[in-house]
Amino acid sequence: MTMFENVTRALARQLNPRGDLTPLDSLIDFKRFHPFCLVLRKRKSTLFWGARYVRTDYTLLDVLEPGSSPSDPTDTGNFGFKNMLDTRVEGDVDVPKTVKVKGTAGLSQNSTLEVQTLSVAPKALETVQERKLAADHPFLKEMQDQGENLYVVMEVVETVQEVTLERAGKAEACFSLPFFAPLGLQGSINHKEAVTIPKGCVLAFRVRQLMVKGKDEWDIPHICNDNMQTFPPGEKSGEEKVILIQASDVGDVHEGFRTLKEEVQRETQQVEKLSRVGQSSLLSSLSKLLGKKKELQDLELALEGALDKGHEVTLEALPKDVLLSKEAVGAILYFVGALTELSEAQQKLLVKSMEKKILPVQLKLVESTMEQNFLLDKEGVFPLQPELLSSLGDEELTLTEALVGLSGLEVQRSGPQYMWDPDTLPRLCALYAGLSLLQQLTKAS
């Protein structure tokens, strides 16, 4: 996970714990997430590691007939996050331990991340709603044909001034052990990096779903659910496709770890329906991509494209006569989404863990810690059951510490015990899903 992602996720949690404020994943995309921008929700999104949205090149205003322009988004003022982050540098506030913020030109030595919110005022929305939808707009036609749902950015959290972020802290040096060198992990873990975030950069946002009514009427309701569709139901095949995509989405409320476990099990069952050859080939495909985040993301896009078109696909390592059903594609897409949430270093550690056949132990470790603390919203140190680690040799234990440590779960051999930080939950959920898939595939192989 990049430093930018770490900061935006911590910010979203700090300002809106367990809420609907979505952190931005990519710095280069921030201009496409301003108020009124249209975005797409990624296929097989899950609230456990964050509903993920994809930029488009259009705003709501682009797809409306000409008419009155809305007033500028309302500035609701600066947040107190600046002072909280200042305090955290001294060790007292709940933001990532691995990030500090350094002021740049125009900021004092002690300045940190200062943010403000901009939101679409109700009167501005009323003004825009006087304009009809451009029903023949090619973008709208394309989205309707693909059964996509469109969302409108209604509120953003953005930087007030330019800041430079530096990664620092003990996480840099924890895992720079000799046996990691062949994996290329030392450079990706034990290093410093900095990123400059410009003034006015969107860090997090809220969306509401666009609803099309008839040919040119539209609305942006305050309350939505996963069963709602942007476009009126059309032909049957399109309806089936949308149901498939939304079927595994989580509701707005987490009941705890059990809900995550049931969701992962549902998707795993679809993978289990593949033949042994199919599962072995899928494992081979994924093993070649782990540690190559860009290629893994390309696979995710290809799978999304397959769902868009509603046809069967095959992966490179699969025999040509082994086709994937839409249900299988959806399940694989779910797990690939989880794996892309992990850093390249973690992905390489997963490959090493498969070689050493310690995935079951790692899965049990992650499962046990989340089962105990899933709804806990405060940091704490807790005892770890010794039997969770007793079967691991020294090298295997260090590898496991690194794998979970990069998701923010700090395991300490003395005790043994572990440090729980609620900010780590989304990353641990993604790691749990990734471990579950790989364990199933290695077992079948």
Curated annotation (Swiss-Prot):
Paired cysteines (S-S): none
Record's keyword terms, sorted: Cell membrane, Cytoplasm, Lipoprotein, Membrane, Necrosis, Palmitate, Transmembrane, Transmembrane beta strand
Expression (tissue specificity): Expressed predominantly in the gastrointestinal tract and, at a lower level, in the skin. Also detected in mammary gland. In the gastrointestinal tract, mainly expressed in differentiated cells, including the differentiated cell layer of esophagus and mucus-secreting pit cells of the gastric epithelium. Down-regulated in gastric cancer cells.
A single cellular component GO annotation: membrane
Gene Ontology terms describing biological process: defense response to bacterium; programmed cell death; pyroptotic inflammatory response
Annotated spans, Triggers pyroptosis: 1-251
Keyword Transmembrane helix: no
Signal sequence interval, chain numbering: none
Post-translational modification remark: Cleavage by S.pyogenes SpeB relieves autoinhibition by releasing the N-terminal moiety (Gasdermin-A, N-terminal) that initiates pyroptosis.
Binding positions (a cardiolipin): R9, A10, L11, A12, R13
GO molecular function, one term: wide pore channel activity
Transmembrane parts of this sequence: 78-95, 99-120, 163-179, 183-197
Protein origin, superkingdom: Eukaryota
Site ((Microbial infection) Cleavage): L244, I245, Q246
Record comment regarding domains: Intramolecular interactions between N- and C-terminal domains are important for autoinhibition in the absence of activation signal. The intrinsic pyroptosis-inducing activity is carried by the N-terminal domain.
The family this protein is said to belong to: Belongs to the gasdermin family.
Protein name per its UniProtKB record: Gasdermin-A
Species in which this protein is naturally found: Homo sapiens
